[in-house]
Amino acid sequence: MAKKITGYIKLQVPAGKANPSPPIGPALGQRGVNIMEFCKAFNAKSQGMEPGTPLPTIITVYADRSFSFESKMPPVSYLLKKAINLKSGSKEPGKAVAGKIKRSQIVEIANTKMPDLNANDVEAATRIIEGSARAMGLEVVEG
């Protein structure tokens, strides 16, 4: 018989840097999950990623206080900023341009993010990423 699920916890955890301090500790402690066990398992699973990369993680908590977790790809905003070495997006998107990004870089990000996106093909995923880039105040250029 399947375990009874008592809840889900959504967190953005830096790859390889999960520790019991806030926000991870209190969120897991409220549900009675063994915090150190999660931290060790998460750090082991995210070992291949670049340290510090934020990973959206969904933790499923079961009635017997055990857990399972699933990590997704980093957020699009993080990938866009990393692609053009930007600290933050534009303060006034649509008016002020924070930077320029090539369409080839956007296609690369779309391929990386494809499993998490609600798109049927890379072309649709590329349009989603382009929209995110424009919303951050980035100008999409050919290339």
Curated annotation (Swiss-Prot):
Pfam families: Ribosomal_L11 (PF00298), Ribosomal_L11_N (PF03946)
InterPro entries found in the cross-reference section: Ribosomal_uL11, Ribosomal_uL11_bac-typ, Ribosomal_uL11_C, Ribosomal_uL11_C_sf, Ribosomal_uL11_N, Ribosomal_uL11_N_sf
Cysteine pairings via disulfide bonds: none
Keywords: Methylation, Ribonucleoprotein, Ribosomal protein, RNA-binding, rRNA-binding
GO molecular function (one): structural constituent of ribosome
SMART domains listed in its UniProt record: RL11
Modifications made to the protein after synthesis: One or more lysine residues are methylated.
GO CC, one annotated term: cytosolic large ribosomal subunit
UniProt GO BP: translation
Stated role: Forms part of the ribosomal stalk which helps the ribosome interact with GTP-bound translation factors.
PANTHER family: 60S RIBOSOMAL PROTEIN L12, LARGE RIBOSOMAL SUBUNIT PROTEIN UL11M
Family statement drawn from the similarity comment of this UniProt entry: Belongs to the universal ribosomal protein uL11 family.
Subunit structure: Part of the ribosomal stalk of the 50S ribosomal subunit. Interacts with L10 and the large rRNA to form the base of the stalk. L10 forms an elongated spine to which L12 dimers bind in a sequential fashion forming a multimeric L10(L12)X complex.
Name of the protein this chain belongs to: Large ribosomal subunit protein uL11
